[in-house]
Amino acid sequence: MCILGNTLDYGPFGFLDRYDPMWICNTSDYNGRYSFHNQPSVGLWNLNALATCFSKLIKKEKIISKLRLYEPALVKEYRALMNQKLGLSDDSTDYKFQDELLKIMQRDKVDYTFFFRQLS
């Protein structure tokens, strides 16, 4: 994760083909810390590490209150992007379809990227 939003490649990585939330793209990650499913928590860990750098400049309570905004913002944006990928309205908040679709994709070993490419 880069504060500038750049993509950094430290390799060896891969891409998510067959949808499997527990898939690990980093071949040196034996415990699944960086699995697809764990990406949000790793993002929060990275933000915590960055916040530590500012701990002498910003009160701890303020840092904590800002870090607590991460998960709700991430979930909201993720759901909105999934709605967009699926051609659903932006204001749709019934996420059962998204969740069921991902379960089916995992069960049937559907190529994640190809599925959404074909859908578009």
Task: Annotate each language-model stretch with its function.
Residues 1-44, 52-56:
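Catalytic activation segment of kinase domains across protein kinase-like and atypical kinase folds
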Residues 30-120:
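Regulatory N- and C-terminal appendages and interdomain linkers associated
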